[in-house]
Amino acid sequence: MAIRVIPCLDVKDGRVVKGVNFVGLRDAGDPVELAAEYGRLGADEVTFLDISASTEGRATTREMVTRCAETVFVPLTVGGGVRGVDDVDVLLRAGADKVGVNTAAIAHPGMIDEVADRFGNQVIVLSVDARREPDRPSGFGVTTHGGTRSAGLDAVEWACQAVERGAGEILLNSMDADGTADGFDIEMIEAVRAAVDVPLIASGGAGKVADFVEAARAGVDAVLAASVFHYHTLTIAQIKDGLRHAGFEVR
């Protein structure tokens, strides 16, 4: 299977936040333009994280997903604030291909079963924000609230439980590595990879092409990044060339 390369965009009230500076785009805050641009540049998928605090903001994001689905021809994952089956239904109807779940699934793990039963495992991406917690059995713990609070769960055990309940994919985000550009947390990836057999996406810490190759060697099926793309540190083509050169299949 080809390794997928996935840019991630944070969306608030229907606009992209965090610096994104594509030259030539009329408005670097428009998620649809950016997603289309990433699609043209070879992205295999695009992930949106909705960080809107308000109901109105979420409604705006839904409209954005609909526009995106009409103009962007790569699979679209939307996460952030998904609280149950109804939210998943709304996003899928709007045009999302997959939906990311995180905090709500920690509070109500049965939600994973409900979504899987209704829509199929393939639509659920469990997002795990993990960091090193030496007292956990695996050495890695689950966090919430942007990494500021411990969820009291072992990251590997939680990933296994979620897969048993029907999660079709795991997005593993290292809160320690996130934003450092020092590379993915390879030990964490290897620990989760050894425990689950669903597709695994690595996130958090990428800074150079070698980081993506290292994650692929650790067994991930996809690599996700934000700032390296937004700030033009790396292009999708450079990452795919690096992976190809290292012997991995890419699309």
Curated annotation (Swiss-Prot):
GO terms for biological process: L-histidine biosynthetic process. Its main location: cytoplasm. Keywords: Amino-acid biosynthesis, Cytoplasm, Histidine biosynthesis, Lyase. It is found in: Cytoplasm. It is an enzyme of class 4 (lyase). It catalyses: 5-[(5-phospho-1-deoxy-D-ribulos-1-ylimino)methylamino]-1-(5-phospho-beta-D-ribosyl)imidazole-4-carboxamide + L-glutamine = D-erythro-1-(imidazol-4-yl)glycerol 3-phosphate + 5-amino-1-(5-phospho-beta-D-ribosyl)imidazole-4-carboxamide + L-glutamate + H(+). Its EC number is 4.3.2.10. The active site is at 10, 129. GO terms for molecular function: imidazoleglycerol-phosphate synthase activity; lyase activity. Belongs to the HisA/HisF family. IGPS catalyzes the conversion of PRFAR and glutamine to IGP, AICAR and glutamate. The HisF subunit catalyzes the cyclization activity that produces IGP and AICAR from PRFAR using the ammonia provided by the HisH subunit. This is Imidazole glycerol phosphate synthase subunit HisF. The gene is hisF.
